[in-house]
UniProtKB/Swiss-Prot annotation:
Gene that this sequence comes from: SIS3
Annotated knockout phenotype: Resistance to high concentrations of exogenous glucose and sucrose on early seedling development.
Tissue expression per record: Expressed in roots, stems, leaves, flowers and siliques.
EC number(s) given by UniProt: 2.3.2.27
Primary location group: membrane
Signal peptide: 1-27
Keywords in alphabetical order: Membrane, Metal-binding, Signal, Transferase, Transmembrane, Transmembrane helix, Ubl conjugation pathway, Zinc, Zinc-finger
Protein name (database record): E3 ubiquitin-protein ligase SIS3
Annotated metabolic or biological route of this protein: Protein modification; protein ubiquitination
PANTHER family: E3 UBIQUITIN-PROTEIN LIGASE SIS3 (PTHR47179:SF1)
Pfam families to which the protein is assigned, alphabetical: zf-RING_2
Organism the protein comes from: Arabidopsis thaliana (Mouse-ear cress)
């Protein structure tokens, strides 16, 4: 069983049952261990306690990691990130090295004092626990190295795009983006790739379709942030956090992205990167497939506007979106189309065109 924030595994039940049984046996035979040259009973109590604390810290880290999703505000994510740094520092710099050293010490004590154990069964139990300890420590090391190599591979792919990488940056990324978020992002990217394979209009648009889509993109409201919204604190395309003064473009589904990011995205895929809703649900690309682009700039503009008027059903912008962002943003451009949309009307480029202008 594995739940985000709990992460209770099957071996936790095995460990707890083994711990309870061993503690009872050691407590019953406590005085008999004094005949041994080395205090094996103290060793096993300390080892059990340390492993138990180690697992508790893992539970705490998993709980902190569950609060690092994009659905949470930047302040909460920063607090969870700092908490993970502290917890993981205790695990990796204190408890994990101590368990290695303590296990080696226990092995040496056991080889020199195994004949003094009260019962034969305890000798085998002690040996099994040592083997379990070594296997667990090695598994933790291999799992961590594997996760680090996986993240490093992702950063190497980014380096091909000119983004600088560092080993420290990979470590910070592993803490800031927990495993569940990393896997969810991978699934989302695979879903986007599948969508792109079946619907990737940017590669197949005719010039007339391209002009119409570009005109629709430019009609989307554009703002400059004067405050960062808690529920949408970063651009999902470039994964950079929003800051005051950033220029963003708002979609009808009330999701914000950097202007340059979303413009490039919509030229290839007219679905919202976050919720997968169609940004232009009334756009009929098939109706534009036979239109030809004119050779002059003036004729291209008239042709694009006419195409929009003919093949897009006029609908008012979603008022809920503007109400939501009104306190956070102010417009970069206050052209007539945007002002009309903010007032609940229809942009004139979509309504005032007559057939005579074609």
């Amino acid at each position: 069983m594995a739940m985000r924030g709990v992460d209770f595994k099957w071996y936790d039940g095995f460990f707890l049952s083994m711990l309870a049984t061993s503690v009872i046996i050691v407590a019953v035979n406590w005085n008999r261990y004094r005949a041994c040259e080395y205090p094996l009973h103290i060793w096993i109590v300390v080892d059990y306690t340390t492993v138990f604390i180690f697992r508790v810290f893992m539970f705490v880290d998993n709980g902190l990691a569950s609060g690092l999703g994009l659905d949470f505000g930047s302040q909460q994510r920063n607090a969870m990130f700092c908490g993970r740094v502290v917890v993981l520092s205790v695990l990796s710099l204190l408890l994990y090295p101590f368990l290695w050293a303590w296990t080696v010490i226990g092995t040496q004590w056991f080889t020199k004092s195994k004949t003094c154990l009260p019962e034969e069964g305890q000798k085998w139990g002690f040996l099994i626990w040592l083997m379990f300890s070594y296997c667990g420590l090695l598994c933790i090391a291999f799992i961590c190295v594997g996760k680090w190599l996986t993240r490093r591979q992702v950063h190497l792919l980014r380096a091909q795009q000119g983004i600088p990488i560092s080993e420290f940056g990979i470590l910070v990324d592993m803490i800031r983006v927990p495993d569940w978020a990393f896997e969810a992002a991978g699934q989302e990217m695979r879903g986007i790739s599948q969508d792109a394979a079946t619907y990737h209009p940017g590669l197949y648009l005719t010039p007339a379709q391209t002009e119409a889509v570009e005109a629709l993109i430019q009609e989307l409201p554009k703002f400059r942030l004067k405050a960062v919204p808690d529920d949408c604190g970063e651009c999902l395309i470039c994964l950079e956090e929003f800051h005051i003064g950033h220029e963003v473009r708002g979609l009808p589904c009330a999701h914000n992205f950097h202007v340059e990011c979303i413009d490039q995205w919509l030229r290839l895929n007219v679905k919202c990167p976050r919720c997968r809703c169609s940004v232009f649900p009334d756009l009929d690309l098939s109706a534009l497939s036979n239109l030809q682009s004119s050779g002059t700039e003036q004729h291209s503009q008239v042709n694009t506007e006419t195409s929009e008027a003919r093949y897009i059903r006029s609908q008012p912008q979603s008022e809920s979106y503007f109400l939501r962002v009104q306190s956070l943003i102010h417009p970069v451009h206050t052209d007539t189309a945007l002002e009309t949309a903010e007032n609940g009307g229809v942009p004139p480029v979509l309504t005032d065109l007559s057939p005579s202008r074609r």
